[in-house]
């Protein structure tokens, strides 16, 4: 029933969007380096009128206009994005299909390349904040980005980062207890102490630089570090996606979040494994990262992306 309701809601959003006849843009893309304890790059996708060309970044291929001017007109809403972690390490380039689609739909997307760190729950939210500040201060974007309309998306560990940036508190004692009881959830529990040493670790306090986000989209989110009390401040519209054949247990992650949030989120499931939210792979990437690029029999990753990228664009437009 919930899936039916979501489908109808998204269909209505699509009709409303069509009636509004939003302007058609092409995708611009650029990078900047942000200074931090470990400097990091930020990928920015944005609306432009310049022609797109084929671009290769390592094993990733996409169409965009590199370093083109931002389209003129009204200010554009901003969408922050946090990629996954773990092995293999994540990158926003693995989500270029989605990020560039949002740029063509009239959003400015800010996506840091999170460097490796021993404190990802602390460092990645800070990197998101620094990336946003740097883009809003950049003369190319300062009068084109709307600082009053900011949303955020995250995939896998990036889903946890998204929740923290929105004001959620992590609870390592809760995470440790979950992993003690659910050792089979290896994607959620790798490296997590289950010997009782985390039992008295207090929940984190609210992230000092929590942003006034208007809406969130979570793709296969890492939800095990959160419990109901730590999510109590997140009373905002949210869309949560899960993969039907994921090895990240939904009852401890995506579904657990949906039950614990103060406002019931919209939920959607797609066929495939955890990495189905990564773009369809080039032959080079498939050879380098077969786990990321392999899908269960019958999974049509390209068709799934075509569906959810428009659903996400419609959801963000309705809430930003």
Please identify what each model-predicted range represents.
Residues 21-79:
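Domain-level recognition of soluble alpha/beta enzyme cores
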Residues 52, 63-120, 246-250:
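Short substrate-entry loop that stabilizes the transition state in hydrolases
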Residues 118-151, 160-164, 173-189, 193, ...:
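Alpha/beta-hydrolase active-site loop
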Residues 224-225, 244-249, 275:
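Acidic catalytic loop of the alpha/beta-hydrolase fold
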Residues 234, 240-242:
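Short beta-strand/loop motif that positions the catalytic acidic residue
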Residues 236, 247-260:
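Short alpha-helix in the alpha/beta-hydrolase fold that links the catalytic acid
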Residues 261-292:
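Catalytic histidine neighborhood in serine/cysteine hydrolases
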Residues 283-320:
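Catalytic active-site module of serine/aspartate enzymes centered on a nucleophile-bearing elbow/loop
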């Amino acid at each position: 029933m919930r899936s039916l309701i979501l489908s109808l809601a998204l269909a209505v959003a699509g009709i409303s969007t069509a009636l509004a006849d939003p302007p058609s843009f092409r995708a611009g893309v650029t990078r900047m380096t942000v200074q931090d304890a470990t400097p990091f790059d930020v990928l920015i996708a944005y609306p432009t009128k310049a022609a797109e060309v084929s671009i290769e970044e390592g094993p990733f291929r996409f169409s965009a206009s590199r370093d083109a001017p931002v389209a003129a007109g009204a200010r554009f809403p901003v969408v922050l994005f946090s990629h996954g972690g773990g092995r293999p390490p994540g990158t926003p380039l693995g989500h270029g299909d989605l990020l560039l689609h949002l740029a063509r739909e009239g959003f400015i997307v800010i996506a840091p390349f999170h460097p490796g760190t021993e404190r990802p729950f602390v460092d990645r939210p800070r990197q998101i904040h620094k990336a946003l500040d740097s883009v809003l201060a950049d003369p190319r974007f300062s009068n084109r980005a709307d600082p009053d309309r900011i949303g955020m998306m995250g995939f896998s560990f990036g889903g946890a980062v998204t929740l923290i940036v929105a004001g959620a508190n992590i609870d390592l004692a809760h995470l440790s207890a979950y992993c003690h009881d659910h050792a089979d959830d290896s994607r959620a529990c790798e490296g997590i102490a289950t010997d009782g040493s985390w039992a008295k670790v207090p929940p984190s306090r609210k992230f000092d630089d929590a942003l006034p986000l208007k809406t969130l989209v979570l793709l296969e989110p890492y939800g095990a570090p959160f419990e109901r009390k730590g999510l109590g401040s997140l009373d905002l519209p949210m869309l949560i996606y899960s993969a039907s054949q994921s090895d990240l247990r939904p009852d401890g992650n995506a579904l657990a979040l949906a039950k614990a949030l103060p406002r019931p989120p919209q939920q959607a499931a797609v066929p495939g494994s955890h990495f189905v939210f990564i773009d369809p792979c080039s032959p080079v990437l498939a050879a380098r990262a077969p786990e990321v690029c392999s899908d269960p029999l019958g999974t049509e990753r390209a068709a799934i992306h075509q569906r959810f990228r428009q659903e996400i664009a419609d959801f963000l437009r309705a809430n930003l």
